[in-house]
Amino acid sequence: MTEIEKHYNKHKEENRLLTRHGKVEFAVAMKYIHDFLPTQDKHLFKIADIGAGTGRYSVALAKEGFDVTAVELVKHNLEILESKHEHVKCWPGNALDLSFLPDETFDATILFGPLYHLHKEEKKLTALKEARRITKKGGKIFAAYLLNEYSILSYCFAQNRILELIKSGNVSEDFHIVPKENELYDYVRLEDIDRLNKMGGIKRIKIFSPDGPADFMRKELNSMTEETFKKFIEYQICNAERQELLGAGSHIVDILEN
């Protein structure tokens, strides 16, 4: 069993997006996805969800009438997704090799998750290249990353581990997480994403933060009334593209045109 499988067997992805901070992420991401989806003839619009987890996005989009294909590496997650019987075509697979999916098949491709776990730039570029291969020319790709500063602040400083992690080489002198091969996550800064796009010759349409400060405000979100919480989601949608806030959340989504 891989480290990724061990992690997702223990930490249920199904539950994460049902928390209030997870609901912020989902609501904002879905708003941006819908900006590029048709309102008619939805059954003709093909969406690939690579790293689909237990199907939070796949199932929601399939229920709206879109033609959704989901690919998931973790067997436990895939079994949950398949059990939902929501007309989602499900495949076991790895974002680095989507050879079972034909070229230029999908109108949009969602890549939420795989890039979190790929430590080297060449592997990230391979995943992006595969996503581009299966996406039609002019189609959209939604690529999500984990952000460096969230980990530095919420883990390294908040848990008082920053000094030992710098000493061990896990954090650089300029406070960038340095992932070891056996670690689960990789964290990036905006300039890292820009460099990947330049290396891959990838065109960005826009970039946005799906969660903003939500992960830093879990207790506060949980104490909000339903009305106030809805207003917080409105706030994040309104501010998701603000340049001065992009790198401060825990996730970021790069919308690319193939």
Question: Over which residues does each language-model region extend?
Answer:
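A short SAM/SAH-binding and catalytic strip from SAM-dependent methyltransferases
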Residues: 108-122
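Conserved class I S-adenosyl-L-methionine
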Residues: 1-41, 56, 142-169
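A short glycine-rich, Lys/Arg-flanked "PGG" loop and its adjoining helix->strand segment in the class I
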Residues: 125-137
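A short acidic, Gly/Pro-enriched loop at the edge of an enzyme's catalytic core
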Residues: 99-109
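A C-terminal cap/extension of S-adenosyl-L-methionine-dependent methyltransferases
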Residues: 206-258
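Short alpha-helix
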Residues: 184-201, 207
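Class I SAM-dependent methyltransferase SAM/SAH-binding core
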Residues: 55-97
